[in-house]
Amino acid sequence: MEAKASARYIRVTPMKARRVVNLIRGQQANEALAILKFAPQAASEPVFKVLESAVANARQKADREGLAFKPEDLVVSAAFVDEGPTMKRFQPRAQGRAFRINKRTSHVTVVVATPEKEEVR
């Protein structure tokens, strides 16, 4: 079973958000939540919320389909960050000049899944 959650237009640069997402990819969901809770990066809070939402979506999906749900079985199967729109601002400088400031945004997507049981032959 697979569940997905995403957050769009997060005010964190994609490069900084990718550093956080790389920490949790492939981890168990409970471990990933613990890692994010204590990660010092500012991007860890929105990623934590997205991962919590993905776990909640998995619980809802399991209830709908009548499947047994154990949160400790979930694994972060995919996690990625895409670049959102950039807000452009101007910083006034001396002698009538202006420097452009790019305020970048991110779209964070996290997919959790229960690993498939491999058949032993």
Curated annotation (Swiss-Prot):
It comes from the Bacteria. One of its GO terms (molecular function) is rRNA binding. Keywords: Ribonucleoprotein, Ribosomal protein, RNA-binding, rRNA-binding. InterPro entries: Ribosomal_uL22, Ribosomal_uL22_bac/chlpt-type, Ribosomal_uL22_bac/org-type, Ribosomal_uL22_CS, Ribosomal_uL22_sf. GO terms for cellular component: cytosolic large ribosomal subunit. One of its GO terms (biological process) is translation. Disulfide bonds: none annotated. SUPFAM superfamilies: Ribosomal protein L22. Gene3D superfamilies: Ribosomal protein L22/L17. This protein binds specifically to 23S rRNA; its binding is stimulated by other ribosomal proteins, e.g. L4, L17, and L20. It is important during the early stages of 50S assembly. It makes multiple contacts with different domains of the 23S rRNA in the assembled 50S subunit and ribosome. The globular domain of the protein is located near the polypeptide exit tunnel on the outside of the subunit, while an extended beta-hairpin is found that lines the wall of the exit tunnel in the center of the 70S ribosome. HAMAP family: Ribosomal_uL22_B. Belongs to the universal ribosomal protein uL22 family. Part of the 50S ribosomal subunit. This is Large ribosomal subunit protein uL22.
